[in-house]
Amino acid sequence: ICQASTTLYGGAIRAGMTIIERNNHTIASTYVPRGLDAMVSYGDSDLKFRNDLGFPVTIKTYTVGNTLYVEFYGQDPGWFDFIEPVSWASGHSAWAQRKYYKNGSVIRTENLPSSYYYN
């Protein structure tokens, strides 16, 4: 289930969604850089995000073989071309940001929730 929540989190980051709640795994995942995972646990931890872009967004999920895809569809917001998530780690801690680009230049950098891992 956590690979699905991590994939959805990555899509939400890249689509410009406002992250409301996100929890990392206690042990760092091998399938995503530290700081970019999302763990869910029924009754305890959840992944929540909100669309503040000012227009509706449709989320499409599907699988091809063993690969899960999450796609966000909506209007072009106009003020950015794409979003790149970046992360870095030191010891047990990890930090992440998303960088908004317009015409090849970073126009905005936003901190994402930090993480702490036991490994």
Q: Which role does the model predict for each range below?
A:
Residues 1-119:
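Well-ordered beta-sheet/strand-loop patches within structured domains
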